[in-house]
A protein has these predicted regions:
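Amphipathic alpha-helical dimerization/coiled-coil segments
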Residues: 2-28, 48-49, 97-116
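Alpha-helical residues within the helix-turn-helix
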Residues: 60, 77-78
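Short, hydrophobic-biased segments on the C-terminal half of alpha helices
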Residues: 73-74
Length: 116
């Protein structure tokens, strides 16, 4: 059975039920999967250190093929971890801190409610 976007997930913990928004949970899982990769973690660190960078800046700094850097940036972008900004012919990538903070709060809430 496939969950609808407006449904909730109920976790049982003893006599206590924990209700979670299914759509928010899916978004959190997407972000966690995206950042659970060494290279993508390095990309995030570089972007945090430099505020914003082009794909060229990133692949030179990380000594990667351009296509590899682009693929990993696309995964991070789809997950909402990084955002893009066009300046002339250049596209700059930056960490979307608001999105990261939102997911972080959701994960904290989940771990508090499940007692882990």
């Amino acid at each position: 059975m496939r969950k609808q976007k407006n449904e909730t997930v109920v976790l049982k913990k003893g006599k206590k039920d924990i209700e979670l928004d299914y759509a928010e949970l899916r978004k959190a899982v997407l972000v966690l999967r995206a950042v659970n990769h060494k290279l993508r973690q390095q990309i995030i660190e570089l972007l945090e250190e430099n505020e914003k960078m082009t794909v060229t800046d990133l692949y030179i700094k990380l000594r990667l093929e351009q296509s590899v850097a682009s693929q990993h940036l696309a995964i991070l972008r789809r997950a909402g971890v990084v955002a893009t900004e066009r300046q002339g012919k250049f596209i700059y990538y930056r960490v979307d801190k608001e999105r990261i903070n939102h997911i972080s709060r959701l994960v904290e809430e989940l771990t508090e409610n499940t007692g882990n």
